[in-house]
Amino acid sequence: MLDRSRLRIAIQKSGRLSKESQQLLEQCGIKINLQQQRLLAFAENMAIDIMRVRDDDIPGLVMDGIVDLGIIGENVLEEALLTRRSQGDNPCYIMLLRLDFGDCRLSMALPIDEPWNGPKSLQGKRIATSYPHLLKQYLDKLGIHFKSCLLNGSVEVAPRAGLADAICDLVSTGATLEANGLHEVEVIYRSKACLIQRSGELSNIKQSLINKLIIRIQGVIQARGSKYIMLHAPAEQLEEIINLLPGAESPTVLPLAGNQHRVAIYMVSNETLFWETMENLKNLGASSILVLPIEKMME
């Protein structure tokens, strides 16, 4: 039985968010041993339990107070909200953070030989989807009448199988659509992974753990989008060089020993550094340019 005094976090057991959710928790310093077939895993160094479940179970577990936190795609969360509201429920949760992974879009797709003249092309069509409420919300706002065909998997095969005229499904690269003779015509919802918390009062111990976890997650996300940069540069080009490298804070600038015309620059840049940027630095007279990844970061 679960120890109710420990913080409970639900993550996807398998699927597109599973690996990155696990990596995020590990990068936050939570030592966990996730065995493939086990529902529960226990952190070795913090009072945290990890529950590994189907992604569409996570919103309900959070809203019903079974777990304290959940990492879930916004698309799954929004569909669960709309489903519960359609049943007369008033679901509650707290959105804590949007995360930096799990990007996808919920899109309409038609057979390649079908013309697209805007949403009106869907009038009276039968549309296969795993997200009936998100689809209905979108098309109702446009005054489009349609028939829904609910499928929980392999939505992209519905037109070829004669089950539907069009589909509404998650798209990452579009390769699966193309392989099934479909083309993406309209994005109706964009989604990322997010961290949600159950509503209601928590113990001071749990709330303290959540606050610590939020700070660590923010640090991990910020570090992923930042680089530590070291270089030597002409003193007279200092301002131009700094403008090429948007930083989290003002850079550290030190004189080079034995050379009063050149300086050493150390800074954290919050933009991904491309080869073009490094070449521009070189053109301004910079040398010994080092770009290093940052594992953790806290301001």
Swiss-Prot record:
- Provide GO CC annotations from the record: cytoplasm
Q: Tell me which positions the record assigns to the signal sequence.
A: none
Q: Which Pfam families match?
A: HisG, HisG_C
Q: What pathway is it annotated to?
A: Amino-acid biosynthesis; L-histidine biosynthesis; L-histidine from 5-phospho-alpha-D-ribose 1-diphosphate: step 1/9
What switches its activity on or off, per the activity regulation note?
A: Feedback inhibited by histidine.
As recorded in UniProt, its EC number(s) are 2.4.2.17
Keywords (alphabetical) are: Amino-acid biosynthesis, ATP-binding, Cytoplasm, Glycosyltransferase, Histidine biosynthesis, Magnesium, Metal-binding, Nucleotide-binding, Transferase
Q: Which PROSITE patterns match?
A: ATP_P_PHORIBOSYLTR
Query: Which residues are listed as membrane-spanning?
Result: none
GO terms under biological process:
L-histidine biosynthetic process
The cofactors named for this UniProt entry are:
Mg(2+)
Any single GO molecular-function term of the entry would be: ATP phosphoribosyltransferase activity
Cross-referenced Gene3D superfamilies: 3.30.70.120, Periplasmic binding protein-like II
Q: Where in the cell is it found?
A: Cytoplasm
Q: Reaction catalysed? A: 1-(5-phospho-beta-D-ribosyl)-ATP + diphosphate = 5-phospho-alpha-D-ribose 1-diphosphate + ATP
Read off the InterPro entries from this record. ATP-PRT_HisG_long (IPR020621), ATP_PRibTrfase_cat (IPR013820), ATP_PRibTrfase_CS (IPR018198), ATP_PRibTrfase_HisG (IPR001348), HisG_C (IPR013115), N-reg_PII-like_a/b (IPR011322), N-reg_PII/ATP_PRibTrfase_C (IPR015867)
Q: What NCBIfam families does the entry give?
A: hisG, HisG_C-term
Give the family this protein belongs to, as stated in its UniProt record: Belongs to the ATP phosphoribosyltransferase family. Long subfamily.
Instruction: State whether it acts alone or in a complex, and with which partners, per the record.
Output: Equilibrium between an active dimeric form, an inactive hexameric form and higher aggregates. Interconversion between the various forms is largely reversible and is influenced by the natural substrates and inhibitors of the enzyme.
Function in brief: Catalyzes the condensation of ATP and 5-phosphoribose 1-diphosphate to form N'-(5'-phosphoribosyl)-ATP (PR-ATP). Has a crucial role in the pathway because the rate of histidine biosynthesis seems to be controlled primarily by regulation of HisG enzymatic activity.
> What is this protein identified as?
ATP phosphoribosyltransferase
Q: Which organism is it from?
A: Blochmanniella pennsylvanica (strain BPEN)
